[in-house]
Structure formats: C-alpha cells, structure tokens
C-alpha cells in the first residue's frame, strides 16, 4: 500500500482495479 493505493480509493473502483493490475504486473502485490 502506497500513495497510488489511496489515490485509487479516491478515484473509484476502476482506478483501484488498475492499480492492482499494476502491482500484479510488477510483482509488488
């Protein structure tokens, strides 16, 4: 959980899903 996590929460579920996909691609999840 970092800055984008909070930003994604504020932007909405679409942003959260995009952020989760980003983490998965980089193995940060």
Swiss-Prot record:
Location of this chain's protein in the cell: Secreted
- PROSITE patterns in the record: GALANIN
**Keyword Secreted carried by entry:** yes
User: Would you tell me the Gene Ontology cellular component terms?
Assistant: extracellular space; secretory granule
Sites where Alanine amide occurs are at 29
Could you give a single Gene Ontology term from the biological process aspect?
neuropeptide signaling pathway
* A molecular-function term among this protein's GO annotations: neuropeptide hormone activity
Which Pfam families does the UniProt record give? Galanin
Q: Which UniProt keywords apply?
A: Amidation, Hormone, Neuropeptide, Secreted
Q: Which InterPro entries match?
A: Galanin, Galanin_pre
Stretch forming the signal peptide? none
> What family, per the record?
Belongs to the galanin family.
Q: What does this protein do?
A: Contracts smooth muscle of the gastrointestinal and genitourinary tract, regulates growth hormone release, modulates insulin release, and may be involved in the control of adrenal secretion.
Q: What's the protein here called?
A: Galanin
Task: Name the gene behind this protein.
Answer: gal
